[in-house]
């Protein structure tokens, strides 16, 4: 699946819903499933920072809560208001590894429309998964 220009407009819509009163770092996420459904997510901060949730995890949890399962996802697009695209944090990379195919594209954009694409495996090389627990 290749990046589609409308992904940028969609992810920017999600970003506007960010609840980030402490950092003012608004993150939006747009998830496309293999059956064509779309989900929107955003970061939600908490005064106790560790309790905050990132847009990437919020969107994946939403999709799982609505019946989707690991491997059902086609791509995720994430955007930030920064000079360059920002990559998912370590916790989000681990959740992507758990719920998404290794070759799933992760499109990272910024407010200018710059885009970088990496696969889940590229974002978390030598990632830990359930297979490691067998």
Task: Give, region by region, the residue ranges found by the protein language model.
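C-terminal binding/interaction regions
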Residues: 2-20, 71-134
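A generic structural signal for short beta-strands and their flanking turns/coil linkers
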Residues: 25-27, 40, 72-74
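Amphipathic coiled-coil signal-relay and dimerization helices
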Residues: 39-42, 117
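Compact, glycine-rich, soluble single-domain proteins
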Residues: 43-58
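Short, solvent-exposed cationic patches
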Residues: 54-74
């Amino acid at each position: 699946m290749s990046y589609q220009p409308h992904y940028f407009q969609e992810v920017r819509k999600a970003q506007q819903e960010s609840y980030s009163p402490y950092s003012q770092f608004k993150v939006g996420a747009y998830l496309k499933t293999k059956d064509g459904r779309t989900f929107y997510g955003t970061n939600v901060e908490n005064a106790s920072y560790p309790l905050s949730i990132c847009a990437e995890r919020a969107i994946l949890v939403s999709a799982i809560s609505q019946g989707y399962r690991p491997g059902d996802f086609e791509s995720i697009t994430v955007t930030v208001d920064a000079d360059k695209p920002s990559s998912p944090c370590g916790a989000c990379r681990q959740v992507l590894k758990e719920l998404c195919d290794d070759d799933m594209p992760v499109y990272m954009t910024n407010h200018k429309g710059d885009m970088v694409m990496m696969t889940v495996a590229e974002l978390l090389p030598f990632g830990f998964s359930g297979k490691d627990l067998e």
